[in-house]
Amino acid sequence: DGISASKVLADGYGQCNTKGTLFMALLRACNIPCRVHGFTIDKSLQKGAMTGFVYRNAPKNIFHSWIEINFENQWYELEAFILDKTYIKKLQERNPECKGAFCGYGVAVKDFRNLIIEFDRNNTYIQSEGINQDFGVYDCPDELLKEHHQEISAFKAFAYRHIGRHLMNRNVRKIRER
């Protein structure tokens, strides 16, 4: 989660917290006021995106965040930017029987067929139904991470950063390309 915006951009991928850091840097470069909202989510919503030993060893409560922007004097909660439309479309194609709530593959929503993922002066969500603890809003990711971070051993953090996140991103890429 402590990966810089420039590293996320250079890597070409990230997860919710690192993409949020990049998004905030871009928003601020455009003089759009923003803040980060921290949470934990239940790991069950990651099943499918995380598989095998990565899923088995993931903590039950996974640190998560979304970005809030102040646009035209109103705050909006933006979460759906963390998953691309191609990936979401592939998930919908793989789960044609799902007409209501969906939880898995990095998604936890009330209405899987009618997602609100495009910003048009509205909130956008993609994992909000998996939230199990709310940490509130912070002006910058560093402030949030000083108070709250992923509860995980040093060994597991190292393994996730150097192996797990790459396996998870590879799995997401496979789903997207099917």
PLM region descriptions:
Residues 41-178:
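His-Asp-centered catalytic microenvironments across diverse enzyme cores
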